[in-house]
């Protein structure tokens, strides 16, 4: 790819960032589509995020992806949020229209799309959701919008717990889905929730390097063959949770599904063009 002065810049703002597959995936898609954009990763944490957004405007970047730890903070720096993004309280995509910034969240739509593409119908189902960060709440919000009956959210009593309670209140007030929040330390409640669940989704970074030998499921007997286990982590591809799930006879969906579908939606938001899905799946080895 020969980058010329006509190219527009799209970024990804996160910390850490060197593990991300998004730059490779998006640049392959942009080149295949013959578009004059290039996608670059920038190490940006909460402290440097405000300045990075000013830089985005000054450089007239087309937009940026937003990942940990900036997804919730980013809501404060855009001019407009989609209804789904308001429900989530976090964004992963910013589109810059001549200095007017719009915030979107494609994490939720991407993950739910991956579930649907596997042939699983979420309507009327119960999900156990691990974590209350930007990705997790995005999945919960989109699942609620698309027909989940109940979401049982488990999170440690950390800085995200109050945010989880606020998220549950927003979803309960604006959708027909019932969301409850429980401390993950309550292992009896966790076991009971899994016993009656249809879906278990890990929306935390547990399982991602350097935590690749960890899982929030301490007892594999809690997993049953009727359970669909889905993962947001894609590095490593086969997390400990997915290994446990397969050993228990569960159907699984790895983190590549969410990465692919959320990225496809981002691509269209930035470029107005269709994402070359099958080509990207092939060259990135997704689903292989």
Curated annotation (Swiss-Prot):
It holds the Pfam family Shikimate_dh_N. Substrate binds at residues 71, 107. It is an enzyme of class 1 (oxidoreductase). The keyword Oxidoreductase applies. Keywords: Amino-acid biosynthesis, Aromatic amino acid biosynthesis, NAD, NADP, Oxidoreductase. Its EC number is 1.1.1.282. NAD(+) binds at residues 132-135, 155-158, 205, 232-235, 255. The keyword Membrane does not apply. It comes from the Bacteria. One of its GO terms (biological process) is aromatic amino acid family biosynthetic process. Pathway: Metabolic intermediate biosynthesis; chorismate biosynthesis; chorismate from D-erythrose 4-phosphate and phosphoenolpyruvate: step 4/7. GO terms for molecular function: quinate 3-dehydrogenase (NAD+) activity; quinate 3-dehydrogenase (NADP+) activity; shikimate 3-dehydrogenase (NAD+) activity; shikimate 3-dehydrogenase (NADP+) activity. PANTHER family: BIFUNCTIONAL 3-DEHYDROQUINATE DEHYDRATASE_SHIKIMATE DEHYDROGENASE, CHLOROPLASTIC, SHIKIMATE DEHYDROGENASE. Homodimer. This is Quinate/shikimate dehydrogenase. It comes from Escherichia coli O17:K52:H18 (strain UMN026 / ExPEC).
């Amino acid at each position: 790819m020969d980058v010329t002065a006509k190219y527009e810049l799209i970024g990804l703002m996160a910390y850490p960032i060197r593990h991300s597959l998004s730059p490779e995936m998006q640049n392959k898609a942009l080149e295949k589509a013959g578009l004059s954009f290039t996608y670059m990763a920038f190490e940006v944490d909460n402290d440097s995020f405000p300045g990075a957004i000013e830089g985005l405007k000054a450089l007239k970047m087309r937009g940026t992806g937003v990942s940990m730890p900036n997804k919730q903070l980013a809501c404060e720096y855009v001019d407009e949020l989609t209804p789904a993004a308001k429900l989530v309280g976090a964004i992963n995509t910013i589109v810059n229209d001549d200095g007017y910034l719009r915030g979107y969240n494609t994490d939720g739509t991407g993950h739910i799309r991956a579930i649907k593409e596997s042939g699983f119908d979420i309507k009327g189902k119960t999900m156990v959701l691990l974590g209350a960060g930007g990705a997790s709440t995005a999945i919960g919000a989109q699942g609620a919008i698309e027909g989940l009956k109940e979401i049982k959210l488990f999170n440690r009593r950390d800085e995200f717990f109050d945010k989880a309670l606020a998220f549950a209140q927003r979803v309960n007030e604006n959708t027909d889905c019932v969301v409850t929040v429980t401390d993950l330390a309550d292992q009896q409640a966790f076991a009971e929730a899994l016993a009656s669940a249809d879906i278990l989704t890990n929306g935390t970074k547990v399982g991602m390097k350097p935590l690749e030998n960890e899982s929030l499921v301490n007892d594999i007997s809690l997993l049953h063959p009727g359970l669909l286990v889905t993962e947001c982590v894609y590095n490593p591809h086969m997390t400990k949770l997915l290994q446990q799930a397969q050993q228990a006879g569960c159907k699984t969906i790895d983190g590549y599904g969410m990465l692919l579908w959320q990225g496809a939606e981002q691509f269209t938001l930035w470029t107005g063009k269709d994402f070359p899905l099958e080509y990207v799946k092939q060259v990135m080895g997704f689903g292989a």
